[in-house]
């Protein structure tokens, strides 16, 4: 059985890890052994934060909708309840965008919600 020398594969693996660690500070960016751990940890953070990002954006949308609804004399909770009763199926992302960029349209939605809650 022939002898296997691993110089090429090892160098390729090291290059790959160091490329992923590009921009890291200190030895984390240029020493393979340290960079390997840093890249693994970065991957864990990336995996975790891809999930956290969804929660953070939802919180942001709700905060924006709440602020806009309060300007129109309602709380977010009342507004959400009224949307359901009025069968208005607009998601939070779109509602927050409307609230930020087109307050007149948001006010008309609030008027529809208030009318449905009053009835």
UniProtKB/Swiss-Prot annotation:
Q: According to the lineage, what is the superkingdom?
A: Bacteria
Q: What PROSITE patterns does this protein map onto?
A: RIBOSOMAL_L20
SUPFAM superfamilies xrefs: Ribosomal protein L20
Write the protein's name.
Large ribosomal subunit protein bL20
Q: Which residues form a coiled coil?
A: none
Tell me the organism's taxonomic lineage. Bacteria, Pseudomonadati, Pseudomonadota, Betaproteobacteria, Burkholderiales
Q: Which Pfam families match?
A: Ribosomal_L20 (PF00453)
Q: Which PANTHER family match?
A: 39S RIBOSOMAL PROTEIN L20 (PTHR10986)
Q: What does this protein do?
A: Binds directly to 23S ribosomal RNA and is necessary for the in vitro assembly process of the 50S ribosomal subunit. It is not involved in the protein synthesizing functions of that subunit.
Task: Give a GO molecular function annotation for the protein.
Answer: rRNA binding
Record flagged with keyword rRNA-binding: yes
* This protein's UniProt keywords: Ribonucleoprotein, Ribosomal protein, RNA-binding, rRNA-binding
Organism, as annotated? Albidiferax ferrireducens (strain ATCC BAA-621 / DSM 15236 / T118) (Rhodoferax ferrireducens)
Look up keyword Ribonucleoprotein and say if it applies: yes
Give the gene symbol.
Answer: rplT
């Amino acid at each position: 059985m022939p002898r296997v020398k691993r110089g090429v594969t090892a160098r390729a693996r090291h290059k790959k890890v160091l490329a992923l660690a590009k921009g890291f500070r200190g030895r984390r960016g240029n020493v393979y052994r340290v960079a390997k751990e840093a890249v693994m940890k970065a991957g864990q953070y990336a995996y975790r934060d891809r999930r956290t990002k969804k929660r953070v954006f939802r919180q942001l949308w709700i905060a924006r909708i709440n602020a806009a609804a309060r300007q129109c004399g309602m709380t977010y909770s009342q507004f959400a309840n009224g949307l359901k009763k009025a069968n208005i199926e607009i998601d939070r992302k779109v509602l927050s965008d409307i609230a930020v960029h087109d307050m007149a349209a948001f006010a008309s939605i609030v008027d529809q919600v208030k009318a449905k809650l009053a009835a």
